């Protein structure tokens, strides 16, 4: 059979069947001309690795797929049974007739962005159910003579902690568990440089991400005899799933993109793809948001909130977001011990309800938003008292609470209907609500669903994610004009699967500016700034001018009490908002250029990044001084996108004063000398606005 080649921009993956019909992978992504690759030479297909190795097919290749058949069979020998292509959609069918099993390897190419999506769909026609134990979304092999892996592990308030190291011989694993907040343990994103560490502008590098809202396992495997071959197995976990005849099981999707010239061009491709194919309304500007949580926690009433609205409007914000604590009648939400599940406004705190609050926001020139946690319930609630069987629990075990709450069982259709109906009713009762923050603050600990029979309890981990996604689909469909923020104790759901129903994600509950700068830097390899919500807070008593400057390089907002601001702090916050509104189109829709990375050798505590508009005629550059620097040594910030034939007007601003330094420079001198670095003091910032229009 002729080889199958599926292109994604400058890159491609190719397959061919061997003489036994087993599908082999011939190549995965390009190498520079003249570089060796494992598929060079006049070799037969048998010399190449299996494209999707199954259990019992080849013991030397760890399986991407494993099942136990209805009759107890475990060996699987799938052979090529067909190939279909329609536009950019490709389907390669593998079949094992003895098992009455089909495995469709599905690929979707995005040539304009150079992105490839890959997943598998499994079905069978046996006499009864089978158990799928492992089903990878993808298991490609690539030529990687000197592979270096960048991974992003985490914890609460420590998401996106990056580490880069060579991939040793053996198996390296990135994994997370759970079905609610898996990204608190490890991010499903990674970078793999194939020929030593990649730079921003040099070196072949692959980016990958499993688009899944539950636990995942990414394995990077090198063998002693063929260390230049690297197999990446990408899948969800726990993966055990009881599958009935004629039912199609689809794995999560794996997202790939490739750059031969470093991480910068890779980032641009992913950002354009995320805006165009993942997040909602990817070409729309996001508002400046004022959130109440760190200003009030549970201590507020209507009068206090209205005073805060006046202060929020004075800072120049556009959206007022009321966080946790607004609901509960019989069990009012005065702390985290009661009220979850009873989504009616607390009449003691909000006698006019949500409509009165929305009207107050509108009078202050603000739109109004609301926090919800619809997947959770407190035992101290009307909902739990009425439906104690609606929670995820294993019979015979105590129901352990986290944050005094339990997880609703979304596998029950009536629970899904409750979640969708709750959000719909809130929006119907207060038509002025324009924004929802969807949160989730605990994991599943006693996995059990009353909706699943005893022999299907293992399906809970997968079915919970799919049920949640169905609820999110319904909510997004019934509220197309409502902006949605994705949150899960911070960045517990920062995945490309769940983001499809949301406009932005809360990256972390950690809002220390220096820590957030590093988190935002690492996340920026994959997510555009408009998707990363960043708020100015008083975390650790930090300097607010510096905190503003860090938040301005993402989707800018505040989470503090305006009444607590000193005159100098208020001036800095107002100036930050004004500057952000001027450059917001660049930050949210422009091309990101990472210039000086955090903690780079020789950086002397400097960090810098910029955003460019069309043809690089307009740009904004943010410079940060994380640690004190000696003023005796000159330093600069590179401007690699400058056009040597243009002349730029440059405005240099800080948030601690109301003036600006204005100069003019030709592009040639900017390319050669960069921008003079003015900062020496710890936790200070500078903003440059460049305009050649």
Residue ranges and their predicted role:
Residues 10, 190-192, 200, 600-644, ...:
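Carbohydrate-binding surface patches
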Residues 120-122, 297, 328, 346, ...:
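Active-site and adjacent substrate-binding regions of carbohydrate-active enzymes
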Residues 378, 384-417, 462-563:
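Glycan-recognition surfaces
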Residues 78, 241-260, 683-690:
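Short Pro-Gly-centered flexible turn/kink motifs
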Residues 281-421, 430-431, 435:
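Aromatic-lined carbohydrate-binding/catalytic grooves of carbohydrate-active enzymes
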Residues 662-693:
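C-terminal beta-strand-rich structural cap/linker in extracellular carbohydrate-active enzymes
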Residues 46-76, 202-219, 256-279, 317-324, ...:
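Glycine-rich, aromatic-flanked loop segments that form ligand/cofactor-binding clefts
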Residues 2-6, 11-17, 23-223, 237, ...:
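Polysaccharide-binding surfaces and accessory modules of carbohydrate-active proteins
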């Amino acid at each position: 059979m002729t080889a199958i080649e599926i292109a994604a921009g400058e890159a491609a993956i190719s397959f061919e069947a061997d003489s036994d019909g087993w599908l082999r992978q011939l190549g995965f992504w390009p190498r520079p001309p003249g570089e060796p690759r494992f598929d060079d030479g006049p070799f037969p297909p048998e010399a190449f690795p299996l494209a999707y190795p199954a259990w019992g097919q080849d013991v030397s290749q760890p399986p991407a797929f494993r099942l136990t058949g209805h009759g107890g069979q475990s060996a699987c020998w799938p052979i090529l049974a067909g190939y279909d292509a329609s536009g950019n959609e490709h389907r390669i069918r593998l079949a094992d007739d003895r098992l009455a099993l089909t495995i469709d390897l599905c690929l979707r190419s995005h040539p304009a962005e150079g992105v490839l999506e890959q997943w598998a769909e499994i079905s069978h026609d046996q006499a009864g159910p089978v158990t799928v134990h492992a089903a990878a979304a993808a298991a490609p092999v690539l030529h990687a003579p000197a592979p270096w892996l960048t991974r992003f592990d985490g914890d609460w308030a420590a998401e996106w902690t990056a580490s880069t190291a060579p991939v040793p011989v053996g198996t390296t694993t990135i994994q997370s568990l759970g079905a609610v907040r898996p990204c608190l343990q490890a991010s499903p994103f990674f970078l793999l440089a194939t020929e030593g560490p990649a730079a921003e502008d040099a070196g072949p590098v692959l980016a990958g991400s499993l688009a899944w809202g539950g636990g995942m396992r990414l394995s990077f495997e090198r063998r002693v005899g063929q260390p230049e071959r690297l197999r990446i197995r990408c899948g969800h976990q726990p993966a055990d799933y009881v599958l009935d005849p004629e039912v199609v099981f689809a794995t999560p999707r794996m997202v790939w993109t490739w750059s031969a010239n470093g991480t910068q061009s890779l980032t641009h491709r992913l950002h354009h793809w995320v805006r165009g194919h993942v997040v909602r309304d990817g070409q729309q500007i996001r508002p400046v948001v004022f959130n109440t949580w760190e200003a009030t926690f549970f201590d507020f009433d209507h009068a206090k909130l209205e005073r805060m609205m006046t202060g929020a409007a004075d800072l120049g914000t556009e959206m007022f977001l009321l966080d946790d604590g607004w609901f509960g009648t019989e069990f009012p939400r005065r702390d985290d011990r009661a009220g979850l599940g009873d989504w009616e406004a607390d009449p003691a705190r909000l006698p006019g309800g949500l409509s009165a609050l929305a009207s107050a926001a509108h009078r202050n020139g603000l739109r109004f938003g609301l926090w919800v946690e619809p997947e959770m319930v407190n035992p101290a609630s009307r909902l739990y008292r009425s439906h104690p069987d609606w929670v995820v629990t294993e019979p015979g075990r105590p129901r352990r609470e986290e944050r005094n709450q339990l997880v609703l069982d979304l596998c029950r259709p009536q629970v899904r209907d409750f979640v969708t109906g709750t959000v719909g009713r809130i929006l119907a009762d207060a038509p002025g609500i324009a924004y929802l923050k969807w949160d989730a603050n605990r994991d599943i600990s006693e996995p059990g669903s009353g909706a699943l029979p005893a022999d299907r309890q293992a399906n809970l981990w997968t079915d919970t994610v799919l049920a949640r996604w169905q609820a999110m689909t319904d909510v997004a469909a019934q509220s197309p004009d409502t902006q949605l923020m994705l949150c899960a104790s911070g960045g517990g759901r920062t995945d490309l699967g769940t983001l499809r129903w949301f406009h932005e994600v809360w990256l972390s509950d950690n809002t220390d500016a220096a820590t957030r700068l590093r988190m935002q830097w690492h996340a920026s390899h994959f997510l555009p700034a408009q998707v990363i919500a960043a708020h100015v807070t008083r975390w650790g008593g930090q300097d607010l001018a510096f905190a503003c400057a860090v938040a301005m390089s993402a989707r800018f907002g505040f989470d503090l009490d305006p009444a607590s601001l000193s005159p100098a702090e208020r001036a800095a916050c107002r100036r930050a908002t004004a500057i952000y509104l001027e450059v917001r189109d660049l930050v949210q829709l422009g091309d990101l250029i990472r210039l000086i990375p955090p903690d780079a050798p020789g950086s002397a505590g400097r960090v810098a990044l910029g955003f460019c508009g069309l043809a690089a005629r307009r740009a904004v550059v943010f410079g940060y001084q994380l640690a004190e620097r000696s003023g005796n040594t000159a330093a600069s910030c590179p401007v690699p996108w400058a056009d040597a034939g243009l002349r730029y007007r440059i405005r240099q601003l800080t948030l601690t004063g109301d003036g600006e330094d204005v100069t003019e420079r030709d592009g040639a001198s900017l390319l050669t000398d960069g921008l003079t670095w003015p900062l020496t003091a710890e936790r200070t910032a500078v903003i440059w606005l460049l305009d050649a229009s």
